[in-house]
Amino acid sequence: MLVVIMFFIAFVFCSWLSYSYLCPYISTKELNKSR
């Protein structure tokens, strides 16, 4: 059970890290496209 919890935490952390890394890139790309 502990392994499942650790795997879930790692998955959430990785997804949050990738989201926080890609969000500004996507927003700046959208801004450049609209400009």
From Swiss-Prot:
Provide the induction entry.
Expressed in the intermediate phase of the viral replicative cycle.
Provide the topology term for how it sits in the membrane.
Single-pass membrane protein
What keywords would UniProt list here? Membrane, Transmembrane, Transmembrane helix, Viral envelope protein, Viral penetration into host cytoplasm, Virion, Virus entry into host cell
Primary localisation category: virion
Q: Which residues cross the membrane?
A: 2-22
Kindly indicate whether the keyword Signal belongs to this entry: no
Q: How is it modified after translation?
A: Unglycosylated because produced in viral factories instead of the classic ER -Golgi route.
Ligase: is it a keyword of this entry? no
GO terms (BP aspect): symbiont entry into host cell
Cite a GO CC annotation.
viral envelope
**Parts of the chain on the Virion surface side:** 23-35
* Entry's localization field: Virion membrane
Q: What does this protein do?
A: Component of the entry fusion complex (EFC), which consists of 11 proteins. During cell infection, this complex mediates entry of the virion core into the host cytoplasm by a two-step mechanism consisting of lipid mixing of the viral and cellular membranes and subsequent pore formation.
Q: How does it assemble?
A: Component of the entry fusion complex (EFC) composed of OPG053, OPG076, OPG086, OPG094, OPG095, OPG099, OPG107, OPG143, OPG104, OPG147 and OPG155. Except for OPG095 and OPG053, each of the EFC proteins is required for assembly or stability of the complex.
Stated family: Belongs to the orthopoxvirus OPG076 family.
Protein name, entry field: Entry-fusion complex protein OPG076
Q: What is the lineage of its organism?
A: Viruses, Varidnaviria, Bamfordvirae, Nucleocytoviricota, Pokkesviricetes
